[in-house]
Regions:
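Histidine-acidic metal/acid-base catalytic patches
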Residues: 7-166
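Conserved strand-turn element in the central/C-terminal portion of the radical SAM core barrel
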Residues: 1-6
Length: 166
């Protein structure tokens, strides 16, 4: 969670992991939360995306995700596929956390299958197969949404797209 102390920015997360210095402790990457790292939530000085970033410019987003994942991928042991609309929960200066969206949310900012590749592949585009767990994260919805077969079909479709791409 990017709202937790020591995890509130990607740079702080790396500093925390380096300070702990344990080979069996790593980072759990969640596509929704880590998108917010690029936006500088909870730590504006560590923002990667430009302040005036326009969401239709995928090249700028991809460059920011490359920078982020290059820094955190070596520490990552678990990977959570997710969608985010670029908004957060929380009102304080360090308690903002990711707002997961449904897989097919039209306001979602991520190209799930493509952007998962920044985590699943190294800088040369080679699969790392380094993660112990890969799952969907983003089921914080009402019962009415969770009880719809479409919700689960969309999640499964997104996960299959990630598998097929990587």
């Amino acid at each position: 969670e990017i709202c937790w102390g020591g995890m509130h920015s990607w740079r702080n997360m790396i500093q925390t992991l380096e300070a702990v210095d344990r080979p069996n402790i790593g980072f759990q990457a969640d596509m929704s939360h880590t998108l917010l790292y690029t936006m500088g939530y909870n730590c504006p000085e560590d923002r990667i995306l430009p302040v005036d970033y326009k969401w239709d410019d995928r090249e700028v987003l991809k460059a920011s995700l490359k920078e982020l994942t290059a820094a955190l991928r070596p520490w990552t042991i678990d990977f959570h596929v997710a969608q985010n609309d670029g908004t957060v929960h929380g009102t304080g200066s360090h308690d903002k956390t990711g707002r997961h969206c449904q897989a097919t949310d039209p306001n979602g900012k991520l190209n799930i299958a493509e952007d998962a590749g920044f985590w699943l592949r190294d800088a040369d585009g080679q699969l790392t197969k380094a993660f112990k767990h890969i799952c969907w994260d983003g089921c914080m919805f009402s019962n009415a949404v969770m009880e719809q077969q479409k919700t689960w079909n969309d999640i499964l479709a997104a996960m299959i797209q990630v598998r097929n791409a990587h």
